[in-house]
Regions:
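Class I (Rossmann-like) S-adenosyl-L-methionine-dependent methyltransferase catalytic domain
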Residues: 2-189, 209-213, 217, 225-291
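Short acidic/histidine-rich motifs immediately flanking catalytic phosphotransfer sites
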Residues: 193
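A conserved beta-strand element that flanks and buttresses the S-adenosyl-L-methionine
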Residues: 197-198
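Hydrophobic adenine-recognition pocket in adenosine-nucleotide-binding enzymes
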Residues: 202
């Protein structure tokens, strides 16, 4: 029997074939709908397929394949940053079911491992910071999983989303939401005895050099733990290609997270990967600590 990775790869190849034939034909037949689907590059890439019909899914995939290739890393970083500041709220609405369909069944195990890793030191960590908090659901969940932590800070580039989160979670007094650049916030407000978290696609928008500097800045704070749940390109082999690569259609960056954490001084206590949302790319789980 073929293994799971081979099955996923075959599904991926079949899907690419269908989008290249049926999808392109539908785009030709329905140009107005195609223009509506393609209004924003990143929204097009991430659009929640559950809200689309089968024909719209094939059209979307065909349009994604037609996107102009971008090779300038600085341009990519700026385009993505601009999107997350100005247009992220609409995308969070599109993908809000991800907390129930992806995070809860596929990602919560690493926080159980974190509890075991911290052991009797759990009480020493007074603050948990989620970088790229999005709609705040993950931060709210973590506040119930780590009752000994007094302060939960959610940082996001989108001022509009932060205001929505403040209203949505007004009853949870442990939560704070801040519209800021994560690097700037950590430099000004970061301190020791902090757990840092990213969930399902945040660090992928950092340039490699900036991400390395960010990890070093956190390491300098003192005692800290970092949980990174981040996507990687399906073909990114960290041993043969140790540096960051472009992946996906936004595109964003597939980083060698273990290498970057180690270079900053952290110890890796957990590393694992699994297929991301049943596709060819991988979801990577890293637990790192500075002590």
């Amino acid at each position: 029997m073929p293994n799971k990775n081979m099955t996923n790869k075959l599904k991926y190849i079949l899907y690419q074939f269908l989008t290249g034939t049926v999808g392109n034909f539908l785009v030709f037949l329905q140009p107005k709908k195609a223009r509506r689907l393609a209004e924003n590059r990143i929204t097009l890439v991430h659009k929640n397929k559950k809200n689309l019909s089968v024909s719209e899914r094939l059209m979307r995939a065909a349009l994604v394949k037609k996107l102009d290739k971008i090779d300038d890393y600085n341009q990519i970083a700026e385009l993505n940053r601009g999107f997350w500041i100005n247009n992220a709220t609409e995308l969070f609405v599109e993908t809000e079911d991800g907390f129930e369909t992806d995070f809860l069944p596929n990602c919560t195990f690493i926080f159980d491992l974190l509890k075991d890793e911290l052991g009797d030191q759990r009480a020493a960590f007074s603050t948990l910071v989620e970088i790229g908090t999005g709609n705040g659901d993950v931060l709210n969940y973590l506040s119930s999983e780590f009752p000994e932590v007094n302060r939960f800070v959610g940082i996001d580039l989108s001022p509009k989303q932060i205001e929505l989160n403040k209203s949505k979670f007004n009853d949870n007094k442990k939560l704070e939401f801040v519209a800021a650049d994560a690097f700037d916030w950590v430099t000004e407000h970061g301190h020791s005895n902090t757990i840092f978290v990213t969930s399902r696609g945040v660090l992928e928008y950092f340039l490699e050099e900036r991400l390395q500097d960010f990890f070093k800045e956190i390491y300098r704070l003192g005692k800290s733990v970092f949980i990174a749940i981040e996507p990687n390109g399906g073909g990114h082999n960290f041993e043969t290609s140790p540096h960051s690569q472009l992946y996906g259609n936004e595109p964003s960056f597939s980083h060698n997270y273990p290498r970057l954490f180690k270079n900053a001084g952290f110890t890796i206590w957990h590393f694992s990967q699994k297929p991301w949302l049943g596709g060819y790319d991988k979801q990577t789980f890293v637990g790192a600590k500075s002590f």
